[in-house]
């Protein structure tokens, strides 16, 4: 999982999730997993 100041969807299977006040992008492709700091 990479940490970015701005997260975005990369492909169609990416989904935005808000958890504990942080924004996450979860995807089938593990390279697309992101977290906002």
Curated annotation (Swiss-Prot):
Keyword Plastid set for record: yes
MF annotations from Gene Ontology: structural constituent of ribosome
Location of this chain's protein in the cell: Plastid
Keyword Plastid: yes
GO BP term (any one): translation
Domain of life: Eukaryota
Keywords of this entry: Plastid, Ribonucleoprotein, Ribosomal protein
Family matches, as InterPro entries: Ribosomal_bL36, Ribosomal_bL36_sp
Pfam family, one: Ribosomal_L36
GO cellular component terms given for this protein: plastid; ribonucleoprotein complex; ribosome
Family classification: Belongs to the bacterial ribosomal protein bL36 family.
HAMAP family according to UniProt: Ribosomal_bL36 (MF_00251)
Protein name: Large ribosomal subunit protein bL36c
Naturally occurring in which organism (per UniProt): Euglena longa
């Amino acid at each position: 999982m990479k940490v970015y100041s701005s997260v975005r969807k990369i492909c169609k299977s990416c989904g935005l999730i808000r958890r504990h006040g942080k924004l996450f992008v979860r995807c089938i492709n593990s390279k697309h997993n992101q977290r906002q700091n």
